[in-house]
């Protein structure tokens, strides 16, 4: 057994009772190792073997589609593999076919601009095939890790000041994002909770304490990785009990709660790991230990045993 495995023992996994037929997997900090955008050989093998075994493998990430599919290009996934992106706002197949999308109300987005201005970086993502599909204001003021993000995404970014001018009622808007230091995003979250628009959008937090970086995704009301996974399962006729979700951060929390089997990565923060027992999550190996592969291998084995028993 992997040294970091706690609740995700053979007995703990078998206690899920139902074979897994749909698994949603986060990318950063889960499928991907730290400081790398390359899926490990063992994880690649497990993904393909899961698909071959009849398990629907879905990727569920805060990244947008344009920054998700290229990282999976060499893995060999099926063209119809669902990619849940923008923290649940958009689901497309790996080949790009739209499966599901929920848009953010531009009026709400414009209202949030005034609430967040002056605290970190504000970004809005548009649903359009051509670049630029990101809108930012005051790029020159962006520093540190966020400046590196801006530089790597520069061809996709339109700089508009004030940013509200890019958010007309005719705009197809996917999500907003606020990003900055941990303290800045604590302040941003405080403002959002007390603003006039509270209750008309979702605010989903992702935190990277080691980098003093936090991201608040501003999504349409009711949208999350959880909602996207639930809609996908319903569309495929797969019961909740037959689903698994694997993740490592706060934006995975609701998805882990909803899935029949929620698996928290061993590299998650201590605060999240402490929640696992009361939330009923399994705690698996870390991303550097190919935790995704470990759990997929268990799911494949359990499914094979269940199908074998059914044939007897």
Regions found by a protein language model. Give the residues of each.
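Active-site phosphate-binding/coordination module
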Residues: 38-148, 267
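Short active-site oxyanion
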Residues: 54-58, 79-81, 174-175, 241-242, ...
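The start of beta-strands in P-loop NTPase/AAA+ ATPase cores
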Residues: 21-23, 81-82, 212
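Non-catalytic pre-domain segments flanking phosphatase-related domains
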Residues: 1-25, 48, 52, 311-312
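Residue-level signal for inorganic ion chemistry
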Residues: 50, 87, 176, 256, ...
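Mg2+-dependent phosphoryl-transfer enzymes with acidic/Ser/Thr/Gly-rich catalytic loops
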Residues: 13-22, 40, 215-312
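Conserved acidic, metal-coordinating active-site core of Asp-based
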Residues: 119, 126-244, 250-252
């Amino acid at each position: 057994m992997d040294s970091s495995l706690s609740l995700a023992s053979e007995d703990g996994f078998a206690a899920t009772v139902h074979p897994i037929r749909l698994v949603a997997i986060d990318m950063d900090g889960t499928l991907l190792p730290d400081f790398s955008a390359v899926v490990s050989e063992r994880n690649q093998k497990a993904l393909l073997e899961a698909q071959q075994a009849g398990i629907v493998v879905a990727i569920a990430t805060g990244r947008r589609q344009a920054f998700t599919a290229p990282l999976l290009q060499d893995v060999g996934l099926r063209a119809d593999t669902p990619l849940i992106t923008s923290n649940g706002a958009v689901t497309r197949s790996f080949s790009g076919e739209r499966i599901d999308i929920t848009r953010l109300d531009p009026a709400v987005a414009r209202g949030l601009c005034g609430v967040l201005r002056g605290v970190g970086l504000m970004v809005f993502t548009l649903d359009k095939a051509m670049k630029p599909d990101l809108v930012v204001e005051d790029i020159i003021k962006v520093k540190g890790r966020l400046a590196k993000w801006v530089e790597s995404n520069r061809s996709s970014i339109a700089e508009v000041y004030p940013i509200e001018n890019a958010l007309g009622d005719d705009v197809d808007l996917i999500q907003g994002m606020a990003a900055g230091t941990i303290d800045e995003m604590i302040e941003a979250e405080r403002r959002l909770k007390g603003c006039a628009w509270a209750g008309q959008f979702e605010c989903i937090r992702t935190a990277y304490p080691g980098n003093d970086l936090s991201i608040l995704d501003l999504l349409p009301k009711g949208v999350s990785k959880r909602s996207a996974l639930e809609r996908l399962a319903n569309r495929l006729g797969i019961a909740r009990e037959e689903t698994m979700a694997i993740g490592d951060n706060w934006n995975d929390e609701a998805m882990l709660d909803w899935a029949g089997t929620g698996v928290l990565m061993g590299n998650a923060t201590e605060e999240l790991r402490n929640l696992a027992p009361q939330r009923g999550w399994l705690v698996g190996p870390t991303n550097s230990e190919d935790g995704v592969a470990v759990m997929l291998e268990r799911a494949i084995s359990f499914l094979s045993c269940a199908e074998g028993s059914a044939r007897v």
